[in-house]
Amino acid sequence: MAHHNGPRKKTRYKFKKDLRKRGIVPVTSLIQHFEIGQSVHIVCEPSIQKGMPHRRFHGKTGKVIGQRGRAWMLTIFDGNMEKIVIARPQHLKAQK
């Protein structure tokens, strides 16, 4: 087969959900609100492609710096480099 370079390549196991967590996503995850400066975890929701950050940021933790439309802007350190990631709330979980 030909070599493909899609945004979800090499995510066969990374984006796999637990059997009991499959199905419709709760509405509360869609309407989450975060405070600026709050720490959040990036956990990509594989059943919703819209607003999903790049697979390299899956499992990382960042700080909320603002909102852009329905999405949230986060700062994340990728090595020593600070990067801005834009993701919808379905793919974010507040740090406890």
Curated annotation (Swiss-Prot):
* Keyword Ribosomal protein attributed: yes
Key words, A-Z = Ribonucleoprotein, Ribosomal protein
Check the record and name the Pfam families matching this protein: Ribosomal_L21e
Q: What biological processes does GO assign it?
A: translation
Q: Does the keyword Ribonucleoprotein apply?
A: yes
* Disulphide bridges: none
Q: Name one GO cellular component term.
A: ribonucleoprotein complex
Please provide, alphabetically and separated by semicolons, the GO molecular function terms listed in this UniProt record: structural constituent of ribosome
Family (UniProt): Belongs to the eukaryotic ribosomal protein eL21 family.
Q: Which HAMAP family match?
A: Ribosomal_eL21
Protein's name according to its UniProt entry: Large ribosomal subunit protein eL21
The organism of origin for this protein: Methanosphaerula palustris (strain ATCC BAA-1556 / DSM 19958 / E1-9c)
The taxonomic lineage of its organism, from the top, reads:
Archaea, Methanobacteriati, Methanobacteriota, Stenosarchaea group, Methanomicrobia
